[in-house]
Amino acid sequence: MTHMFEGVGVALATPFTNNEVDFNALERHVQFLLNNNIQAIIVNGTTAESPTLSDEEKEKVLATVVKLVNHSVPVIAGTGTNNTYKSIQASIRAKEIGADAVMLITPYYNKTNQRGLIQHFETIANEVKLPVILYNVPSRTNMTIEPETVGILSHNPYIVALKDATNDFDYFDQVKQRINTNEFALYSGNDDNVVKFYQRGGNGVISVIANVIPQEFQYLYDQRQNETDITNYFKPIEKLLEALSLDVNPIPIKVLTAYLGYGHYEVRLPLVPLEEAQCKQVERAFEQFKAGEQ
């Protein structure tokens, strides 16, 4: 079995204009990503503001991306919730629309234990019969998929990968010891740790910053064996990432997707936009980064 993808998958931001999904901007953004060597597109995840998208919007966004991508790279749909059976329904619908895989966040608020996590994920996987990427992001859910649990879940034929947003390399190493790395992929959920993640054997990243610098971020993966080269290449990206840490994702990255012309600079409540001075700071950091690349 081969991995779902190797390298950079983009956690796609949802463009808005006047608080409506801007499908024209969405199509142009996806085409930009496809033209710049992206290996997968993840829709309806954290960066997409999925909690404030209606089911109809999620389905239409997914259908738009699936049609445009036309099997050139995997399209992965975020369908996980803290309701197992709603997650099944959303995943089945994503499969019908044409998603190549689903990404499932850990249940939140109605937290469970590790035994409950195993049953939750396996129930969805066995019912939907589509490749599943587990999504571990304890900073948002206050729930961790323990390494032993990942190991158990990795034996399910439909559960094929983990998006690890812990930024904890002890956790990464423990997970890696418990999986068959030829069949189960490990993707970083943190743009700022990708160099180290690749050096320790990670298979790629589900990236926020690749919304705006897809080719540059894929280069880091392509050159991962050249430690000196990618360490130096990553330094200006780190500076841009610092500017993108002014607020929670996706508030800062949408400054730049709007700057590139993909929708207006809008987020949906309860998220609020950056202040004007902060927006200029993010734009200036991006301009300096691009100037340095020329």
Swiss-Prot record:
It is found in: Cytoplasm. Its main location: cytoplasm. Pathway: Amino-acid biosynthesis; L-lysine biosynthesis via DAP pathway; (S)-tetrahydrodipicolinate from L-aspartate: step 3/4. GO terms for molecular function: 4-hydroxy-tetrahydrodipicolinate synthase activity. SMART domains: DHDPS. It is an enzyme of class 4 (lyase). Pyruvate binds at residues 47, 206. Disulfide bonds: none annotated. Pfam families: DHDPS. Transmembrane segments: none annotated. It comes from the Bacteria. It catalyses: L-aspartate 4-semialdehyde + pyruvate = (2S,4S)-4-hydroxy-2,3,4,5-tetrahydrodipicolinate + H2O + H(+). Its EC number is 4.3.3.7. Signal peptide: none annotated. The record marks 46, 109 as: Part of a proton relay during catalysis. One of its GO terms (biological process) is lysine biosynthetic process via diaminopimelate. Homodimer. NCBIfam families: dapA (TIGR00674). This is 4-hydroxy-tetrahydrodipicolinate synthase. It comes from Staphylococcus epidermidis (strain ATCC 12228 / FDA PCI 1200). The lineage of its organism: Bacteria, Bacillati, Bacillota, Bacilli, Bacillales.
